[in-house]
Amino acid sequence: MSGYEIFKALVNANTDYKDFEWLENNTLSEFEILISVVLTQNTNWKNVLKALINLKQANITKIEDLLNLNTQDLALLIKPSGFYNTKAKYIKNFTQKYFQDFNSFEFFKEEVDREWLLGVKGLGQESADGILNYICKKEVLVVDFYSAKIANYLGYECQSYDELAEFFKKDIAKNQNELNVLLKKECKLYELYQIFHALIVSFCKMHFQGKKLSADGVLILDPLKF
């Protein structure tokens, strides 16, 4: 079994990912996507959007605007996302480290790596990979709680985040053309990884109730079991 086979199964099942904000309905700026990587921790997307609206209304629309915003005021703006005091500290930590090491957002996107991101307090592997893939357009697949749900259901026990990512990435790069045909559009590899992540999240939200998989979900995943 491979990530490629799972990707195909989710597409063939007409899994709807078009409401995934970072893809088909991409109305968010790169700054908003960057901030949302922290805001989305331990909350739902609707609450993240409320926090982003607050930031926009306060004219906090680029990373430079965070420099003169104190942590307490930032926390109030992002309050809808929950754990707002902690998240405000994480965002300020990121901002300070960013301005120590990068002189522009374009330079950041080209030069930042996973090691640097993991050195920022508040950014874990999933958050770091989210920035690399969605902001920097790197060929990095984000895996998460939802990815682990599918892997566990299929009988795959991951021992680490990186092992889970490798499992889902398997055979996708070498079957890029076939996936583009299936999706009926030309996608670069980093875009395929974005779509795959969105498919996984959408599928799990639609078909899992806790650990229980819906009857339709069973029909989609069971043929993939080894």
Predicted regions mapped to residue ranges:
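N-terminal polyanion-binding entry modules of DNA glycosylases/AP lyases
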Residues: 1-109, 181-226
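Short, well-ordered coil loops that connect the C-terminus of an alpha-helix to the N-terminus
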Residues: 16, 45, 61, 123, ...
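Catalytic DNA-binding helix-loop module of base-excision-repair DNA glycosylases/AP lyases
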Residues: 34-40, 91, 110-159
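Short, mixed-charge aromatic SLiMs
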Residues: 57-68, 114-122, 165-178, 221-226
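Noncatalytic linker/hinge segments flanking ATPase motor cores
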Residues: 78-82, 105-109, 130-135, 170-174
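Phosphate-backbone recognition surface of nucleic-acid-processing proteins
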Residues: 133-197
